[in-house]
Structures are given as structure tokens and as C-alpha cells.
């Protein structure tokens, strides 16, 4: 993992390109999202809508709770052209260490939502992308960033909204946490806002916000920052006129640079232990410790490939670093090309005379030969081992080995596996090894594995004008060791799934974070012990936290994520599993990959093992865009294949076979819920139809039946006692059965349990579980106490919503709702109360008139060569919000859907759930 990739960093842009030109040339960049209108904003004398496209708003919202950052970026663009479509490009750049968890594009009521699945399935589904044609998102990689770009068309007089969510654990570096947002809109944005909200139980000790592109006067006017106790807040909301300064007549924005928020927390108490919902997070960064003296060896590549700027910048950095080595430290330098040479051959004290002599040696050395990396490292290790063996354990300084190379081993031992073994056997866990890889022409994965195997990390040094500063920045992170052999201990019988809790060294200005899962039995208190070695003494500490007091503390969190401690644990665990798999092979690597994949799917993270596809959004070849994590070794700003433009439903013709819109806003849902109300969205009409089915409890109804594949969904009704005599007994779905015979898959779902293949004694899951069981191309994603999603490979995707009843609710039993997310690959012969509507449906509504209920309209509908009396009404869609739901306006067909459904409703009664 790249040690320099810390904090949060994001770059956004909306590029506006005219569809009328043969060559797509960007006319402007913009940022947009939902924001508040400005009161008394003066009318601008300039055009803020180049090409007729208005970047209406942008909101960057970051909520941090105990280092866990939840980031939502929402942007909106409006095409004001009366008759012409426009192409819009959405660019987002996020840290490589962050995980995307959600992405959606909305246009004219149609929402296209990201669907996270394992990468193998995603690429199997989109084979054309593998053959070199990019499936829509440009996957690029900067220094510590990943960039995604998607081009879509927005119809005349239409708008598009983008929303991206990602999460990360902030890393403390050089005494502070950083949130950096790089903005570059160029075009004026009507409503621009960056809102950062921080909650830290220890209390916030400092908070600062700066923008590189602001004068002091403008910063004072536009940046509002405050902190008190546990809460901190930063708001940046420039008006359009402020965006134009210092050029009031310009149509471009001066917003161009870094917006940076930095903060730290109080360290008055040794313990920062957070417990919530059977998960804990422990943040360890004690203050007032004495700096340890250190033994430091630099191993420097002087092979011929280092010529030019590389060796010049390396020498500059070494000279400055040697100037910062403290009295009491000891050091040496090892150089390797074809031969290996050391400055002294053993450690010498950091006296002024020795430091000056070392600087002279650095100025004079020249490049020579090939790359004997193995020999150079073993010489450096030998020097440190010899020095360490001469000290009693308690008085031993902290030993650090740092290697800088720009190439691959070409002299001496060149087999990478053998080099890893040699280094591992020589160090034997005594001290950390940090590898710095200069440039891109090297095997960075090799350096990374070597560092991880030896308690350190690897960092890439980019060939740029600031390479000297990059090298110095790395050294500053490890310059002041405070503790060695740090171990954080927890009750063995109470803690499960612990993240890394042993660290070779702890450095000033950093922080050790450990998270874990607490066993189900209730604990009134939770304890952590810390053992380490400091400067000439042992370090011991005990932390104790009362869970009830912790609950009171967490209730103070106005915007706290309900499960943020659990997601923090999941984030750290996945990162560690991915790091461990790098140095494993065969079955061990496969097991680690399987664990990381399962957790990535459980928590809906885009990781190196998963991909996010955007359902329903397609280009001219029918490809859907995908979001992937880029590999570390990928070159920055490299585009794969030609640019593709994806078309939103607002500009698509009516489909002839299936609606291309798969995931929709609440008024565009197909499903059945409550007692039971069927809702059918008809994309050709951009309207919905609805009907009820009145049957007795115990009756099983066919919802989906595909005769070509045998796939089926059936639902059994349960009853609810009427609230007063003579009232009809309401019924709900209390049991659902999904069957896919080609894969021998069955799933039985009730409000109590979820059973996979019940006829053969398959596993049983509770709604309290977060799980992703999979069988032969069918993936079930159980989202704890909320819903589950069934995805059939090359088939369909369905959602089952859990409804828990409460006192006073209409239903007296828990029940289920069923929704269709993707039916595009079901056959044209699919039947069932829902399945028959997967094919295109046409209808006409006429004679709209006031109904017997003055709040509703009646009308006449022509559908399937029948004329029906219908009523305009409201139903509720619970697919996005199971507790409250969202209103759906629809034409209601009376008498159990008579005239709309094929046959009569009793034709859909079946004898069994499968």
C-alpha cells in the first residue's frame, strides 16, 4: 500500500461537448450539484451557459466520524437547447485507497444505478470490453488518484444528475488528517458548495481550511470554518459573482486549485476506543513520548539507468535528509550498481563531522554498471544486524532500512523469489524495510511485497520536478520513531476478525488503527492493553470503555452513519486481505481472494476484485459502462480504446423489445408490495399501471414464469386480521420461492429466514445476516434487515424487501415486497402476473374526467383491444425506502386487473411455491 496516499482527494469536472461537431472538442468544464439558491444574487452580464448547457449546481459533501469518511458528490447539468441534444462528460478523481460504494445517473426521471459484482462475472458479461473496446469509463491513474470519465447525451430541454459515493478511513500523517478537494470548473456554476462535517469523540484540537486559488480577502468572505468540542464544520459556498473575481465580465471561473481541510484531535487521554453495534475501533497515537534514537541505513541504486534528473534529485534529497539526521542517531550509506560499496561499512554516530563527510560522499559518487539489488540490500541488512546485536534489548535504537531503486535486478542474484527469501531470512522481523521505487520502469509489485514481508511499505517516487520533495516527504514520516514492537491486545474470547494489531514501529505524527468484531454476547465494558518498547523503557497501557457511555456519545452525532464502525472494520479488513494476497500463491492466494471478494460484495465496495456496471446505460454497441480499480502499475492518464458515448432514456427511441431503462426513480418501478398492489411501469408511455389481487391467505400466485428457461418466481399470501367487523381481510406476501432449474437453484424467502435449496437441505440465513451466497451463476446478496437482491447470470435481477410491522401498523404480520430490477434478458414468452409485462405494452387513455372521489380522476383506457374504466391513484414503492416508501402515480385497473392481465387472475394460482 502506498504510504503517501493519505487523507481524501477528489477532482471533478463536467466537460461539455457539442454533438454537432465532427471532432469532440471540449467547450468548457463545469461542476454541478443540488445546492441552495443565492438570495439577492445580482443578474450576471455574461453568458453562463456555453453551448446552451448550464452547470446548475455542485455539492461535495464529506461527513467524517472517527476518521471514517463518507463522501457524496452530486452534480447537475441542464441542456437548455430547444431542439438539440448535447454531450456531457463527467470526470471524477478519487484516492486510490478509497472504495466507491455507489454511483447513479439520473435524467428526466430515469435513474441508472451502479451494480457491484465480482469482476470475473462483470467482464464475462461484457466481453467486448476485454477485446480492447472501452466500455465507457476511462480508467486512468495518477500519483495517488484514480480517475473515471463517462460521456452521456442529454436531450433538448433536459437535465442530468450524477451522484458518486465513496468511503475511506483517513490516515494521520505528520500530525494531521487531510481532506483535499481539487476543483477545476472553468465554467461558472450557479450553486457551488463544499460541505465538510466532522465528528471526533476525542474532541477536535485544530481545524483549518485553505484554498490555493483564493486571496485572503476572498477566503475570509467565502470559507466558513468552526469547531467546538467534538464537532467541526467547513463550508465553502461562493456566489456566481465571487466566482468571477477578479474579472466581473468573464464567463469562466477562477475556481482552479486545491481546497484543503486539515484537522487533528485531542490526545489528552491515552485511549481512543470506539464501540458500536458489536464492532470496535481503536485509535492509538499517544503524546508526550520521547523520540527514540535510530540506526539508519540508506541503500541507493547507482546503476546507469539512474543518470540525469534521477541521480541529481536523489543526491539533493539525501543531502537534505542527512542535514536532518538528529544527534544520537547512527547511520551509513550503501551504494549498489554492478558492485556493492558502503561509505563506512558500519554505523557511525551522527556527529556534525560525520554528517558533513557523508554529504561530501553523496556529492562525489558516480553511476556505474548494472543493478545488484540483492547484494546492496544484504549489505545494508548486515550493517544493521551487527549494530543491533551489540545493544541490550531495552537500550537498542530503532533500526530502519531504506532502499531507493529505479530498475529491476540485473546483476548477482536476479530471481525475485530468491531475493525475497534472502531478504526475509536476513532481517528475520528485526526492523522494517522501506522501498522507494523511482519512476514507472520497474516492478513495483516486487518492491511492495518485499516491504510488506518485512514490516514496511513501498512508495513510488514519480519522475517529476518535485521528486526531491517526494523523497523528503517520505523520510519525514519515519524520521521520529517513538515506540517499537507495538502490540495492541484484546480479550481473546470476546473479539473476532481482528485487523493488524502488531506493528514494528510507531512514528511521531502517525496513528495506529485496529478494528475488530465483538462476539455476540453482551459486554458492559471493553478493554484493550498496549505493550511496546520506548526509549530505554517498556511502554504499557490499558484502555477501558463502557459501552453504555459510548452509546450516549454516539447519540451526539447528528449525521453519524448508522454502521460506520462496522464499515471502518470492513474497509481495513479488505485492504489487509488484498495486501496479504499479493505475497501469496496458489491455494493461499485463492482463499484470501475469496474472503476479500465476499466482503467487497457484502459491503458493496468497488475493489480490485469487483466491478461496478451501470445498468441500463448503453452505447451504440449495447455495452454498459464499468468502474474498476486500476492496478498500481498502470500508467497515468492512459485511455483504453475509443471514447464511447452512452445514451440516456430521455434521448432514446421507444424500445421495440425491452426497455433499456433498468433501474428507475420511484415513479418507474415494476413490482408488487403490501396487500398486494401490483405496479407496472410502461416505459413506452412513461407512465405506470396498477391493480390489486384479492385472494385468500395460503393461495400461491405465479409472479414470473419463463418457459424457455424454467425460471420462476411464486408468492404465497398470508392474512391480516381486519380492524373492524365486515371489513375485507388484507393479504400480503409472506413467502416467496425463486427457482432456476438450469442451475438447480431454489431460494425460499420468508420474513424470518432465507433458505438456499430447501429441498436438499441447503444453508439457512437470517435477515440479521449480511451475506452473498452464490450457486452456479445465481448470486444472492442479503442486506441486513433490509432487502435481498437475486442476480441470475445473463438472466434477470430481482429485489425482495423485508417489511417489519410495528404496533399500530395495518399489517399484523411481517411480510415481503417483490421488485423487478432487470428483466431485459428474460424471454419474450415470459408469463406471470408480473412477467407478462416484461414485453412492450401499448395503451391509450381518453375521456379523462372527475371521478366519484373528488380527489381522483376517472378515464377510459384502450389496452389489448379492450376498453376499460380506470382511475388515477397513488400506490407506494418501497424498493428504495422499506420503512416509508415513495408515492407512485398510476392508472388503477379494477376487478383484479381484469382486461389488463391475460386471462383472469385465478389462472395464476399454482399448487406449490416451486
Curated annotation (Swiss-Prot):
The modification Aspartate 1-(chondroitin 4-sulfate)-ester is found at residue 675. One of its GO terms (biological process) is hyaluronan metabolic process. Residues 293-453 form the VWFA domain. Residues 39-168 form the VIT domain. Residues 1-30 form the signal peptide. The keyword Ion transport does not apply. The modification Phosphoserine is found at residue 131. Glycans are attached at residues 62, 288, 291, 591, 656. One of its GO terms (cellular component) is extracellular region. Residues 31-36, 676-914 form a propeptide. Heavy chains are linked to bikunin via chondroitin 4-sulfate esterified to the alpha-carboxyl of the C-terminal aspartate after propeptide cleavage. The S-linked glycan is composed of two 6-carbon sugars, possibly Glc or Gal. It is found in: Secreted. CDD domains: vWA_interalpha_trypsin_inhibitor. Belongs to the ITIH family. May act as a carrier of hyaluronan in serum or as a binding protein between hyaluronan and other matrix protein, including those on cell surfaces in tissues to regulate the localization, synthesis and degradation of hyaluronan which are essential to cells undergoing biological processes. I-alpha-I plasma protease inhibitors are assembled from one or two heavy chains (HC) and one light chain, bikunin. Inter-alpha-inhibitor (I-alpha-I) is composed of ITIH1/HC1, ITIH2/HC2 and bikunin. Interacts with TNFAIP6 (via Link and CUB domains). This is Inter-alpha-trypsin inhibitor heavy chain H1. It comes from Mesocricetus auratus.
